[in-house]
Amino acid sequence: MLPKNYDPNEIEPKWQKYWLEEKIYKYKLEPDKPSYAIDTPPPFTSGTLHLGHVLSHTWIDIIARYKRMRGYNVLFPQGFDNHGLPTELKVEKEFGISKDQPEEFLKKCIEWTWQAIEKMRAQFIRIGYSADWDLEYHTMDDWYKAAVQKSLLDFYKKGLIYREEHPVYWCPRCRTSLAKAEVGYVEEEGYLYYIKLPLADGSGYIPIATTRPELMPACVAVFVHPDDERYKHLVGKKVKLPIYEREVPILADEDVDPNFGTGAVYNCTYGDEQDIVWQKRYNLPVIIAINEDGTMNENAGPYAGLKIEEARKKIAEDLEKMGLLYKKEKITHRVLRHTERSSCMAPIELLPKKQWFIKVREFTDDIVEVAKKINWYPEDMFLRLKDWAESMDWDWVISRQRVFGTPIPFWICKNGHIIPAREEDLPVDPRFDKPPVEKCPVCGAEIEPVTDVLDCWVDSSITPLIITKWHEAIKGDEEAKKWFEHNFPTALRPQGTDIIRTWAFYTIFRTYMLTGEKPWNDIVINGMVAGPDGRKMSKSYGNVVSPEEVIPKYGADALRLWTALAPPGEDHPFKWEIVDYNFRFLQKLWNIYRFAERHIKDFDYEKYKHIELEPLDRWILSRLHRIIKFATEELEKYRFNLITRELMTFIWHEVADDYIEMIKHRLYGEDEESKLKAKVALYELLYNIMLLLAPFVPHITEELYHHIFKEKIGEKSVHLLQWPEYREDRIDEEAEKIGELAREIVSAMRKYKNSHGMPLNAKLKHVAIYATDSYEMLKVIEKDIAGTMNIERLEIVKGEPQLEEKVVEIKPIYKRIGPRYGKLVPKIVKHLQENAEEIGRRIKEEGKVEFEVEGQKVVLEKEDIEIKKAVFSEGEEVETAVVRDATILFF
C-alpha cells in the first residue's frame, strides 16, 4: 500500500540507483528500430549545475523518455566541455601553479576537471536525467582531441585555414583573443568628450567628440560626413594632434553620423569595428597604443604604462588645461565586453595579432541554406542565426593564447609556411611532441610549434559527428559505419537562445563542410532562466537560486515540472510558489493513486476492458483520449508548457475533484455491475495518466507503477512501456456534455454546502432539479448526482419551478432608529415582525413606510431596516442555484 505522504527524498534516489543498476537507458544499435539521436549540449565543467542546465537538460530528458516510449532507438549520450579559461584561473588560484610550467599546469587542469565532472554527473543523475552514461564523452579525451584535430586537417586541405595579422577581439584580463560570439555590447554610463583639434595650417579648429580620448596617440584620420555643410570646406586638410604634434588627414565618409556629438570623429586603430572598416577602406596606417595587458604602450608617450582608465582621465585633464577639451557630457552608451564569461565581463580591445582563422564568411549563404532544411522550434529562432550570418565582419578566429585546450595541430616556419601534423600521429601537442619533419618542406627553414590552443567552440561544434562516430567511420571501421549511417544526421539539437550564434552556427558550418549534410533534423531552443524577481540571475542582485536549494525541499520531479512550464524560446523566471504548487500537485496525484490502489491493483482489466461503460466513465475516458492526442501532437512540436498545464489541470480538477468523487458511491456501493464499470474506467484512466506523466515526472510515476501495475504487466520500468495510444472509439461527445453538466451541478451543490458550513459528505435531505433542455441528461446521471452529494431524496423535474419570493423577516437597524425613537423601539420591532410582508411591499414600491405606535408617527426609510426574503416552492421554503437551464432547489 502506498504510504500516506509523498516523500521525494525517499523515492527519487531509490529509482535513480535502480535505473543505473538495471541499465534501463542503455543504448544498443538496432538497425530495425527507428533511430532518434540527440546531440546534447556538453556543459562547461564548472563543477556545478545551475537552473539553466536543469531547464535545458530536463527538456532533453523529457524528449528522450517520450521517444523511447514511442518505440524509437534513442541515442542519448552526455558529454562535458572541458577546456577553457575558467579552469585555468581555478588551477592558478587553488594550486598556485603558473602557466609557465605547462606540463604540470595541464595535469592539474585535468585533475580539477575530473573532480568537476564527477560532481556534475551526480547532479544530472539527481534530476532524473536518463542519458546512457556509458557513452559519456569529454573534450579533453585524447580520442576527442584527435577527432577535432582530424577535422582541422580536413579544413586545412580544403584551404579553409589560414594565419594572418588582423584586428581581433582581445580581452586584457584574460590575455587572449576572442571570437565575435564571445563578446557583446553592454549599456553603461560614461562620458562623451568634446575636443578641439587644431588645423595644421593654423586656420582654426575642428571639434570632434569621442568616448575614448586615450586613443588619441593611435589616431590616423578625422572623418566627417560628405554632406555636412559645417565641415565640407575642411575635407582634404589636416589636423595637428595635440600632445603628439602629428598631422592626420580630414576625410569624408557616408558612415559618419552627423547627428552624433559634433558630427566629426577621429579614426583610431582600433577603437571599434568602424575604425577597422575605415582603416582598410582608405589604406590608413596602423598605430597601436595599447598593450595586451590593458596598459598604454610607448606610442602613448607620456601616458605609457598607465592603465586605460587612468590614461583616459589623465589625457582629458591635460587637454582641458590646454583649452582643447571644452565639454564633458554624461551619456549612456554601449561598451564592448567579454560577455560570454560572466566571471570576466572586461572591456574588449581590438588589437592586431597573428591569429589562426577558419574561412567562414564566404560560406554564410550556404550555412543559411542548410539551416533552412532544419526544423526550428520556435520558427523565429532561425532568423537569429540568419541575422548573425549576415552580420559577420571577418572570419572565425579559432586560436586562443591559453594552455588548457585542444592544441592546434600545426608547426610553422619563419617564412610563414604551415606544416600540418600527420593523421597517424593524432592527437598531437606541438608544444611537447616532435614535429613530423626536421625542416620546412617548402623553404627548408627551421620550424617551430604552434603554442596556441583552439577556441572551445571548435571542440564542441562537431558533437553531432562525435556521437555518431564519424571520426571512426571515416577510418573504415565497419561497426562505426553502421552506427553513423543509422544515427546521422541526428534527430535533435536542443540548446539555449544564447548560443545560437556560436554552437548552432558553427556546428551547422563545420558539419556541412565535413559531410555535406545538415547536422540535425530538428533544433529546439529554450530561453534563459531569470531570478524570482524577473531579472537575470546574478550574485550582485542576490537572486541566484541553485538546484541544491530546491531539490532537498521539493524533490526533482517538482522542479522538472517548473522546467516543463517554460515556453519555447522565451526566458523563464524561477518562482518558488510554482515549485510549491507543483509539489502539492504531486501530493494530489499520490493521493489519487493511493485511493485507487485498493480498487484496481488486483483488478483484471484485460478481462473486462470491453464492457459497456456508464456515461460518466465514457466522459472521463473521452477527455483522457483527447488529452492523449493533444499531448502527443504537442510533444512532437516540443511545446511542453502547453501539455504540462493541460495535464495538471485535467488531473487535479476533472479527475481528482470531479470524476473520482462522482464514482466513490459506485465503488463502495452494492451494485456490482456499476462497481465493475467504474473500476474498468478508473484503471484505464490512471494507467494512461501515469504513462503521460512519465517523461515529465519519472520518479513518482515509477513508484506508482511498481506499487500498482508492475505485478500484472511485468516490464521492469514504467519508462520501458509504450506511450498511450489514442483511441478514436473512446471519443464520446454526448458523454462529454453529460460529464460537464454533472461537474457544474455538483459544483453548485458543493458551494451550497460550503456556504452553510456543511462537510462535503454531509447528507442533503431533499433536492429538486427543474430543467428543460438538459432534463434528459440529468435523468441519465440522477444516481451519480445523488450518490456524489449524499442526497436522500433527489427529484429531476421537467419544466420550470413555481417559485414565490416572500419577506420572512424585517429587522431595524438599531443605530439608525434608536436615537430617533428611543423607548418606542421595542414596539416598532414588534410592528415590523407582525406586518413584515406588507411593510416589505411598501418599502419596495415607495422607498419608505409610515405607521403609528402609541399615537406617535413613525417614518422608516429603506436604509433604516434590513429585509430578509426567502423563496418558497409549494409553500415550503427553499434555496436555489442556477446551472444553465436547470434550477436547483434545496429544501
Curated annotation (Swiss-Prot):
A motif ('KMSKS' region) lies at residues 536-540. A motif ('HIGH' region) lies at residues 43-53. ATP binds at K539. Its EC number is 6.1.1.9. SUPFAM superfamilies: Anticodon-binding domain of a subclass of class I aminoacyl-tRNA synthetases, Nucleotidylyl transferase, ValRS/IleRS/LeuRS editing domain. One of its GO terms (molecular function) is ATP binding. Disulfide bonds: none annotated. One of its GO terms (cellular component) is cytosol. CDD domains: Anticodon_Ia_Val, ValRS_core. It is found in: Cytoplasm. It holds the Pfam family DUF5915. Keywords: Aminoacyl-tRNA synthetase, ATP-binding, Cytoplasm, Ligase, Nucleotide-binding, Protein biosynthesis. ValRS has two distinct active sites: one for aminoacylation and one for editing. The misactivated threonine is translocated from the active site to the editing site. Catalyzes the attachment of valine to tRNA(Val). As ValRS can inadvertently accommodate and process structurally similar amino acids such as threonine, to avoid such errors, it has a 'posttransfer' editing activity that hydrolyzes mischarged Thr-tRNA(Val) in a tRNA-dependent manner. PANTHER family: VALINE--TRNA LIGASE, CHLOROPLASTIC_MITOCHONDRIAL 2, VALYL-TRNA SYNTHETASES. Belongs to the class-I aminoacyl-tRNA synthetase family. ValS type 2 subfamily. This is Valine--tRNA ligase. It comes from Pyrococcus furiosus (strain ATCC 43587 / DSM 3638 / JCM 8422 / Vc1).
